[in-house]
Amino acid sequence: MALILPCTFCTSLQKKNFPINRRYITNFRRGATTATCEFRIPVEVSTPSDRGSLVVPSHKVTVHDRQRGVVHEFEVPEDQYILHSAESQNISLPFACRHGCCTSCAVRVKSGELRQPQALGISAELKSQGYALLCVGFPTSDLEVETQDEDEVYWLQFGRYFARGPIERDDYALELAMGDE
């Protein structure tokens, strides 16, 4: 049975003008909870039960966009990413990778809770301090967040590892590395 359901990974590639033929999950069986898209990426699938349709709770999400000086308020179902839901409502929020690997969509949670199991771009330490990624975040309650500067979050996470003082140029080492003696 072919299920016409957009795969977020494939949709993201298409938005970046990556040529793909289909954007849909095609190998879905009745009662299954997972399927795969054309790139063989596992995708969670929820379907209505035979007793009636599944009702997914929605939550009010308020985003204070510091860079643009605006406040966005919108509803997000618990089973949708906050960034994707905002975009479907014509709300522009900062992002880059859409897969939880960078810190472009990083926010600081002011109130409420969210679930972000795929947020690889943010450490457990920063998550415990209230940082989150909108591109892979699902609201679990009404939520109020504030956007952060990407460099600020990146520095908090990686700065202590790379900040060892200025880098001195070594032309001789550069010549050796390039094979020019």
Swiss-Prot record:
Which keywords describe this protein according to UniProt? 2Fe-2S, Chloroplast, Electron transport, Iron, Iron-sulfur, Metal-binding, Plastid, Transit peptide, Transport
| Gene Ontology terms, MF aspect | 2 iron, 2 sulfur cluster binding; electron transfer activity; metal ion binding
Function text: Ferredoxins are iron-sulfur proteins that transfer electrons in a wide variety of metabolic reactions. Mediates alternative electron partitioning in conditions of acceptor limitation at photosystem I.
Identification of the protein by name:
Ferredoxin C 2, chloroplastic
Which co-factor is required?
Answer: [2Fe-2S] cluster
Annotated CDD domains: fer2 (cd00207)
| Main location as per UniProt | plastid
Query: Could you tell me which residues form the transit peptide?
Result: 1-44
Cofactor binding mode and count: Binds 1 [2Fe-2S] cluster.
Coiled coil segments of this chain: none
> PROSITE patterns from the entry?
2FE2S_FER_2
- Give compartment(s): Plastid, Chloroplast
A GO biological process held by the record? electron transport chain
